[in-house]
C-alpha cells in the first residue's frame, strides 16, 4: 500500500529526494573513478571487504546500486573477516547477513588468528591485525575465484596517505585507486577514491544504513591523526585541497612516465652525434 501524505506534509518526499540526490552524487564519483581507472569488466567477480563501518557499508550499498544499471555484468561477494582477539569494537554479523540476504549478495564470514602472534611480538596490534586481515582477504578472494578486491578507502584516506608518505618517507606516493597483484591475478580497487568522508557520513544518515558500534580504539595511529588535522586546517583556506593533492601525484606520475619514455629514445640514439628526438622536443 502506498503511503499518502497529508496536505502540507512534505517530510517523506523531502527525505526521499535527499536520499536519491546523495545516491546519485556518490554514484557519479564512483563511476568516474571506475571509468578513469578501468576498475570493472564484464565477468568480474568482486570481493567487497566489509567491516560494518560506514565506509565499507557505503561501498557495498553503492556497488549494489551500480550493479543494477552498469554496462558490465559483474558479480558481488561480501566478505567479513573476524579476528580472534577482541580489540574494542563489536563484531555482530546478524544484521549484515540480513542486509546481504535482502539484496541477494553472497556473504562470506572468515575468522583469522591474531592473538597468539600479538603475544609474541611488540609490534603495533593494529598493524598486525590489518596485515593478517588483508592476508585473509587475499586467500578468500583466491578461494572464491574473485579477480577484484574492493576496499572502502575514500578521498580523505588517499590524501592522508599521500601526506604520510611525503613527510615520513620522503616519497610522492598515494593510495592508488587500482593496483594489480599476484601477476595480475587479483586487482585491488578503491571505488570510493573520489568520494569524501563527509559525503559518506551524509549518505549513511540519509539512508539509515545499519552500522556497528564504535570503531576500534587503535584504528588510527597518531601520525595519521596528525595528517587529518593538517588536512582539515588547510581545507579552511583551500576547500579542494584533497583533490589538489591527488592531482599533484597524478602529474608527477605522468612526468616520470614521459621522462622514462624519453630516456628510452635517448638510449636508442646513444651513438649519434646530433641531439636525440627527445632533446629536440624539449628545446622547442
Name each region found by the language model.
Residues 2-162, 168-171, 198-206, 272-283:
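ATP-dependent adenylation/nucleotidyltransferase module used to activate substrates
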Residues 23, 27, 93, 134, ...:
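A structural signal for well-ordered alpha-helical scaffolds and beta->alpha junctions
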Residues 29, 33, 166, 230-233, ...:
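Residues that form generic nucleotide/phosphate-binding pockets
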Residues 38, 42, 171, 175, ...:
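Residue-level signal for secondary-structure boundary elements
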Residues 76, 148-149, 156-233:
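Catalytic subdomain that performs nucleotidyl-dependent activation
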Residues 83-85, 114-116, 179, 195, ...:
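Residue-level detector of flexible, active-site-proximal loop/helix-junction positions
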Residues 131-144, 178-184, 231, 235-251:
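Short, basic, helix/turn surface patches
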Residues 209-284:
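The feature marks non-catalytic terminal segments
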